[in-house]
Amino acid sequence: MSLTERIGQTPKAYELANERGPFSVEVYLNPGTSNTYQYVATTRNKFNNTDYDDLPWNYTSGKKVVTATGVVSGGERYVFLLRSEIAQDIQVTMYNTNGGSNPLNNSNVTRSNVDSSSYYQQPPQVVYNNGDLYGSRTGYSGAELGASIDKGIASLWGYLKQPLVMVGIAAVVGYLIYRYYYMSRPIGFGSSGAYDVPLLDTPLLRDSYRLPQSFTRDPLFRNSV
């Protein structure tokens, strides 16, 4: 499984090992340009707490295979960092090359079902400088997710504030208000279910719905009511 990402001046660190014991991982780098880039393998603790420029960076260009080996102590993790002065896409593929009949499962590597001496490929996992960790199949880190949401909100607002869209929204809101206030109140004869009175409820309009007084004075009308 490979992971292709945009690499710039801010380093991105791929986790090499996260369990106690020795590890040996081959990292295949395949950039999309001929621009130079830098890499280094170090502990997670140094990555989080050291100025990036103080790390022993290696400069290279083009395709590269880097073998990273070491021993993971309890609670420690090893990471592989990449950065580039000129932003470029770099494809990263990682293989666990621990040999023997029981190869270590550092970095969540699953054993090959072919033979015990073959390579065991691990999914590259990226650690950003804020310490968030995510895998190539799990979406965004916390910081990246927040930036994605902000970008989506800004894009939506940019669409909504267009003049024609605003006019359309105002028309829909006005129509809903009209439907609610104008069409939702019964006329002045109890709750007969008839809904057709004006929005303005003034004494003049209320009087306009009353029957003529000659009707109310009629004995037949009074008896029927």
Swiss-Prot record:
Where are the bilayer-spanning segments? 156-178
Gene Ontology terms: cellular component: membrane
Key words of the record = Glycoprotein, Membrane, Transmembrane, Transmembrane helix
What compartments host this protein? Membrane
Keyword Transmembrane helix annotated: yes
Q: How does it sit in the membrane?
A: Single-pass membrane protein
Main location group:
membrane
Glycosylated residues? 48, 58, 105, 108
Q: Which family does it belong to?
A: Belongs to the ascovirus HvAv ORF58 family.
Q: What is this protein called?
A: Uncharacterized protein ORF58
